[in-house]
């Protein structure tokens, strides 16, 4: 497989939209939505913290220094962007709670503010969030481009968007995934296990993005070409598809086609199941009740079947038989942005956008789908 970066396909077919977005505390805000309500009782204090100009790990170091506790005693659900105004929840042993108010000024000097204090019976762990609410301000937006943006947002609100990984995880030179492959092939290894795991996950992410882009390509071909042309295309690709199956695929109203054997998952979370009845699963996808998933390969990964597996095989690459303890999983191919709000201010040439995404999905994927900008940037937020 060619590991060089290729342009990732977009879901919708509009021309590129020109505007300026700066990932900064003024123009980009992220608010974490917790997975569960806090009980207001228990051995763990839970604080909602607002930060700017700090990564989550930098924030944890500040709490460790000021309160005199170990970083391992702090719990958090996910990493938040440094170049943004963000709120998130962190937990710490209850005995440190009295020190929080005493050190208010110390926190404020470090661009931190504690917004609320609660208690709970367990420590917050990675993944203990429902999702995030986002605010983005676009600048240098013309009225025509604002109108185009609204049209794209209508499509995203109706059909959703590709759940691409942002390119930040691939590194400044877009080569983290190549290092991950070298680790899997036992050609290199770093002293820090977390770095090895991160580089391997970069390789998994690269394969996922490539598979998702391939599926988008196939979906567009199914939609845009005749039955005869589709049969010829699949024949050339050595993919087993008959005319009845192709008719069923063309009848799906969603731009991303559900293939026989896709591993579906109840949305936004739930059990995995196989897509065997295309009409039924296509309707559930349109209703946002379930969505197809893509492979993050590994030793215990759940694989697709039938036609979906024939396509997926190309991206089952060197992980299954690797020495590395990479378990693998599935990730939604497609996600649905919710509570989309927008406002265009013509006199300022600014466009304000708000929306919610489930955990594991990135605002940069929505930005990519709106702009249709050529090439990749290094944003993952």
Label the model's feature ranges.
Residues 1-381:
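Non-catalytic, substrate/partner-engaging modules appended to enzymatic cores
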């Amino acid at each position: 497989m060619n590991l060089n970066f290729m342009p990732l396909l977009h879901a919708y077919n509009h021309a590129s939209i020109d505007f300026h977005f700066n990932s900064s505390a003024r123009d980009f805000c992220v608010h974490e939505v917790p997975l569960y309500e806090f009980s207001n009782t228990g051995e763990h204090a839970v604080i909602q913290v607002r930060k700017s100009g700090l990564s989550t790990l930098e924030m944890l170091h500040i709490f460790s220094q000021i309160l005199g506790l170990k970083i391992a005693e702090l719990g958090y659900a996910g990493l938040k962007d440094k170049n943004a105004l963000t709120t998130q929840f962190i937990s710490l042993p209850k005995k440190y709670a009295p020190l929080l108010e005493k050190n208010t000024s110390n926190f404020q000097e470090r661009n931190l503010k504690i917004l609320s204090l609660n208690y709970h019976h367990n420590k917050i762990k990675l993944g203990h969030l429902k999702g995030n609410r986002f605010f983005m301000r676009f600048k240098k937006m013309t009225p025509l481009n604002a109108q185009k943006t609204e049209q794209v947002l209508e499509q995203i609100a109706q059909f959703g968007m590709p759940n691409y990984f942002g390119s930040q995880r691939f590194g400044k030179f877009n080569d983290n995934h190549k290092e991950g492959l070298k680790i899997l092939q036992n050609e290199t290894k770093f002293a820090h296990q977390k770095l090895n795991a991160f580089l391997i996950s970069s390789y998994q992410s690269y394969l996922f993005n490539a598979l998702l882009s391939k599926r988008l390509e196939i979906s567009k071909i199914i939609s845009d070409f005749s039955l005869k042309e589709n049969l010829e295309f699949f024949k050339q690709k050595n993919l087993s598809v008959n005319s009845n199956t192709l008719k069923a695929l063309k009848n799906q109203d969603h731009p991303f086609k559900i293939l026989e054997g896709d591993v579906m998952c109840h949305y936004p979370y739930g059990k995995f199941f196989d897509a065997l009845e295309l009409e039924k699963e296509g309707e559930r996808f349109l209703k946002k009740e379930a969505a197809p998933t893509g492979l993050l390969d590994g030793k215990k990964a759940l694989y697709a079947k039938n036609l979906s597996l024939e396509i997926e095989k190309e991206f089952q690459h060197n992980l299954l038989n690797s020495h590395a303890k990479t378990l693998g999983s599935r990730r939604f191919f497609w996600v649905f942005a919710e509570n989309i709000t927008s406002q265009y201010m013509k006199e300022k040439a600014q466009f304000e956008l708000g929306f919610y995404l489930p955990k594991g999905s990135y605002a940069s994927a929505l930005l990519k789908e709106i702009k249709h900008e050529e090439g990749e940037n290094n944003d993952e937020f």
